[in-house]
From Swiss-Prot:
Belongs to the YbaB/EbfC family. Homodimer. Keywords: Cytoplasm, DNA-binding. The keyword Cytoplasm applies. It is found in: Cytoplasm, Nucleoid. This is Nucleoid-associated protein YPO3121/y1061/YP_0808. One of its GO terms (cellular component) is cytosol. It holds the Pfam family YbaB_DNA_bd. One of its GO terms (molecular function) is DNA binding. Residues 90-110 are annotated as: Disordered. InterPro entries: YbaB-like_sf, YbaB/EbfC.
Length: 110
């Protein structure tokens, strides 16, 4: 059922995967990614835990009549940053399982 090496080999692979996942999670937590909107007029930087670290707003947007547009741009930049962090996490997770013999249909926990 488990092929060469049996269940012992499977357990060894699981231990290796767990170690790699922990390392990857530590790396991702340290990452900072910047999302943008309005062609770079609004930038939001978040870390791997999706905590907002910085918001940058181009001074040209700081006019009273454009409050709603500015709010929309901030939300869009935050969503862009979150999408970028999620993509980075998926790429790193794919590298963790690369080369391991996982059962068909097995999905990573994230």
């Amino acid at each position: 059922m488990f092929g060469k090496g049996g269940i012992g080999n499977l357990m060894k692979q699981a231990q290796q995967m767990q170690e790699k996942m922990q390392q990857m999670q530590e790396e991702v937590a340290k990452l900072e990614v910047t999302g943008e909107s309005g062609a770079g007029l609004v930038k939001v930087t978040i870390n791997g835990a999706h905590n907002c670290r910085r918001v940058e707003i181009d001074p040209s947007l700081l006019v009273e009549d454009d409050k709603e547009m500015l709010e929309d741009l901030i939300a869009a930049a935050l969503n862009d940053a979150a999408r970028r962090i999620d993509e980075t996490q998926k790429e790193k997770m794919a590298s963790v399982s690369n080369g391991m013999q996982l059962p068909p249909g097995f999905k990573m926990p994230f």
